[in-house]
Amino acid sequence: MASEQMEQLKMAMQMMMKKGFAPTFDGSADPIQLRNTIQAAQERMVTEPGVTFVPDQFGDMDAELSVPENSREDAIIIYIHGGGLICGNAFSSRGYASMLAGETKIPVYAFSYRLAPEDKFPAAVDDCFTAYQAILKKHPGKPVFLIGESGGAYLSIVTAMKARDNGVTMPAGVIPYSPVIDVSGALNREREGNKDFTVTPDGLRWLQELYCVDADVKNPYASPYYDDMHDMPPMLLAWDESETLAVDSEVIVERLEKNGIECRHKSYPDCFHAFATTGRGTPESMEILKDTMAFIEDHI
């Protein structure tokens, strides 16, 4: 059963969706309009007091480093934003990135990877790996943690896969919230009990077409479902047990455990897709934030 705060948040979100003040990934909207709506809302989010935003650049990508007061020097976090792979940028990531920085006291990078439908697979994957390598070079010897939600969770997993496959230093840990790992249709997302009001199965298919049209959807970098998850770094996963993408998290957990890889995980009842990024907003997301901090501390 969800907390009272979670129920209130869900009611507010659903009311805003009905009135057209908040978007939903159901396949009914113009993707560019949807992007503009979401990014405008994200850019109005409150940022963490005491966090300084330092601009950076990785090739053609705008990037930003959220630096907290009394910043630690022993680790780096990379936050890869979600948004269905069609929206989000370094600036719109400030709300959650600065909260992560404030809570962990670790500097947090965010960056503007290329988005669909203008730039399809593998543009976002290539950009994330480019940014990851640039950050490793800037901070030699420091443990680097990848955190992302939804599409950003997918990209955090794939970035670790590319590091593994290319002999690049691996992340110290990967923290995917509500990841998507299949764009091929192999996983059944229409299970009984699916109560997801944010990302519907139809909306997911629509996003997949925008991102992967004309691509090999069984390429493991497009669908990590087709990777056996061997030699991956430790992971911490969190998701809503009734969301459309719940099965994706379940598959990751199963494969990591089969390979003997550390995998901390928890599913939550009656929440919503990618609720983890509400941070201090609900008891459920606050628990995930504390678990994230503990996971990072254990792997520095």
Write out the residue ranges for each language-model feature:
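Alpha/beta-hydrolase superfamily serine-hydrolase fold, recognizing
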Residues: M16, G20-F21, F25, P55-E64, ...
